[in-house]
């Protein structure tokens, strides 16, 4: 198991929380809650050691040129593919954006 932390610029805090997926279904759970203004904090707990670069590249592609809401994101991963990770993150971001 490995724990990774990432931080990206963000806008104002989201107004609600979101939970999508679960570790037993699709091997991934994403939890979002409002965070401090201007910061998107992501913590990944993964069963795949040595995957920090893959995660960093995925997040950089997702947030390049965008200003996501300020969030604290917890991701619990048990070997999900990058496509599943992106899908779950997009679902969670859509959920916190719909107020």
Swiss-Prot record:
GO cellular component terms, alphabetically, are: cytoplasm
Instruction: Summarize the PTM comment.
Output: Covalently binds the prosthetic group of malonate decarboxylase.
Q: Which residues carry this modification: O-(phosphoribosyl dephospho-coenzyme A)serine?
A: 25
Q: Does the keyword Phosphoprotein apply?
A: yes
Q: Give the matching InterPro entries.
A: Mal_deCO2ase/Cit_lyase_ACP, Malonate_deCO2ase_dsu
Give compartment(s). Answer: Cytoplasm
Source organism's superkingdom?
Bacteria
Q: Which GO terms describe its molecular function?
A: acyl carrier activity
User: Which keywords, in A-to-Z order, does the entry hold?
Assistant: Cytoplasm, Phosphoprotein
Q: What functional role does this protein have?
A: Subunit of malonate decarboxylase, it is an acyl carrier protein to which acetyl and malonyl thioester residues are bound via a 2'-(5''-phosphoribosyl)-3'-dephospho-CoA prosthetic group and turn over during the catalytic mechanism.
**Protein family (similarity comment):** Belongs to the MdcC family.
Q: What protein name applies here?
A: Malonate decarboxylase acyl carrier protein
Organism listed in the record:
Azotobacter vinelandii (strain DJ / ATCC BAA-1303)
Report the gene name. mdcC
